[in-house]
UniProtKB/Swiss-Prot annotation:
Name of the featured protein: Large ribosomal subunit protein bL20c
CDD domains xref list: Ribosomal_L20 (cd07026)
Record's subcellular location: Plastid, Chloroplast
GO molecular function, one term: rRNA binding
Organism: Rhodomonas salina
Gene Ontology BP, a term: translation
Amino acid sequence: MPRIKRGNVAVKRRKKILKRAKGFRGTHSKLFRVANQQVMKALRYAYVGRKRKKREFRSLWITRINAAARLNGTKYSSVIHSLKESKIAINRKMLAQMAVADPDSFVKVLSSAKAS
């Protein structure tokens, strides 16, 4: 049985890791073992960050809606409650966008939710 040398495969694997570690500081981008650890850590942070981003944006939207609602003399919880009662299906992202970009339409949505 012939001897199989895996030089090509190993080099490609290391180059792939070092390419991913580009931009890291010092030995974190030069030495394979350290770079490999840092790439794995970075991938874990990236995964967690993608989950955290959803939470942070939702809380940002809620804060913006609450601020706009308080300018109009009401609270966030009562706004959401009145929207649900009047069966107005608009999500928090759209409400927050409306509150920032077009406050007049936000007030109209609030008044229509309160009216019904």
